[in-house]
């Protein structure tokens, strides 16, 4: 939905990239008008590992378009994502990130310093993290 709002506000075309092709009809992965040579900015809500976002980039590039960057509302800033975006040569700009949210949450008393330490441990390796260890 964010991409549609941005496209509407800027009076630009909008396309939607599915995670998997439809299993009926034309079986499109990309819905909307995308022509070779178009310059595209991908709009996302959240970047975690970057996997699904970069699959969308690959699909758009396969259709002959140039992805000039990606914007997102939020990123956890996981090292795996930062490396993936660098390797894919996709500039990423976000409205906010993990560090900013932690700072505001701590400053406003929403969380305590101990919570920040726990969350920072989780952030180091979220796939293998276990609470209380």
Question: What does each of the following model-derived ranges do?
Answer:
Residues 18, 44, 96:
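Short beta->alpha connector loops at strand-helix junctions that form conserved
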Residues 2-41, 49-55:
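Short, glycine/charge-rich flexible loops or terminal/linker lids adjacent to PRPP-binding catalytic cores
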Residues 33-77:
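A contiguous pocket-lining binding segment that forms or flanks enzyme active sites
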Residues 1-3, 78-79:
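Short, well-ordered alpha-helical microsegments
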Residues 58-133:
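PRPP-dependent phosphoribosyltransferase catalytic core
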């Amino acid at each position: 939905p964010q991409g549609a709002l941005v496209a509407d506000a800027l009076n630009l075309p909008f396309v939607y990239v599915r995670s998997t092709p439809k299993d009926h009809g034309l079986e499109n992965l990309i819905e909307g008008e995308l022509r070779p040579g178009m310059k595209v900015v991908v709009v996302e809500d959240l970047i975690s590992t970057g996997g699904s976002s970069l699959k969308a980039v690959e699909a758009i590039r396969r259709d002959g378009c140039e992805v000039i960057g990606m914007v997102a509302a939020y990123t956890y800033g996981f090292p795996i994502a930062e490396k993936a975006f660098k390797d894919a040569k996709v500039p990423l700009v976000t409205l906010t990130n993990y560090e900013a949210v932690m700072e505001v949450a701590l400053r406003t008393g929403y969380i305590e310093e101990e919570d920040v330490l726990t969350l920072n441990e989780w952030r180091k390796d979220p796939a293998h993290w276990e609470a209380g260890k």
